[in-house]
């Protein structure tokens, strides 16, 4: 076991001290919001129906697709990292066993990709705070449920933010529009 994996497992085991029946229910529910980006896709659909957020929703779609291609179709298969429950014995999962590789966390990548896009466009403090809290909770739930290493989640967050920023930069630079928020 390498140095990073040892540190990851130590952190995961510390997080396990938070376990309780109530937390189990909360974390399984929160992680379900991130399954296949369902919550974010539903949010995009809702935003598409509004005049104020329609433009943002279109960019959310583009950023989401770029993120899925980079993280789920390229990086995960290329790295092929085992999940923590496959390495540490005696872990009882509270959710269905994920079948794809662990690195990076797709839930974290998609959540922070969507959050970055929302923060770029939205002027609503309520939407920004709610999206921030949800993204953070989804990422944390993956650790609590022992399905990702902390380094998977951290890198997922970084990949999510970068995929959004790079996509927005590319989209806006083609149109000659500055990336700065008005």
Locate each region found by the language model.
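Hydrophobic, aromatic-rich transmembrane alpha-helices
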Residues: 40-50, 111-119
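Alpha-helical architecture
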Residues: 6, 65, 78, 104-105, ...
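Membrane-embedded catalytic cores of phosphoryl/pyrophosphoryl-handling enzymes
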Residues: 91-182
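Membrane-helix interface segments
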Residues: 22-23, 52-57, 123-129
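Membrane-interface junctions
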Residues: 17, 32-36, 51, 124, ...
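N-terminal transmembrane-helix/juxtamembrane module of multi-pass inner/ER membrane proteins
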Residues: 1-38, 72-100, 181-182
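Alpha-helical membrane-inserting segments
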Residues: 46, 66, 70, 74-75, ...
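Interfacial segments of alpha-helical transmembrane regions
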Residues: 43-69
């Amino acid at each position: 076991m390498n140095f990073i994996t040892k540190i990851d497992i130590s952190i995961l085991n510390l997080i396990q001290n938070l376990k309780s029946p109530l937390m189990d229910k909360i974390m399984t529910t929160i992680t379900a919001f991130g399954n296949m980006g369902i919550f974010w896709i539903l949010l995009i659909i809702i935003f598409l129906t509004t005049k104020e957020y329609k433009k943002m929703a279109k960019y959310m779609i583009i950023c989401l697709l770029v993120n899925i291609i980079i993280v789920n179709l390229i990086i995960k298969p290329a790295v092929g990292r085992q999940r923590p429950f496959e390495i540490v014995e005696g872990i009882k999962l509270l959710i269905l066993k994920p079948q794809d590789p662990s690195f990076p966390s797709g839930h974290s990548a998609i959540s922070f990709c969507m959050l970055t896009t929302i923060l770029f466009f939205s002027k609503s403090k309520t939407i920004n705070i709610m999206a921030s809290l949800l993204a953070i909770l989804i990422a944390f739930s993956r650790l609590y449920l022992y399905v990702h290493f902390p380094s998977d989640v951290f890198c997922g967050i970084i990949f999510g933010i970068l995929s959004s920023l790079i996509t927005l930069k590319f989209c806006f630079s083609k149109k000659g529009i500055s990336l700065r928020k008005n």
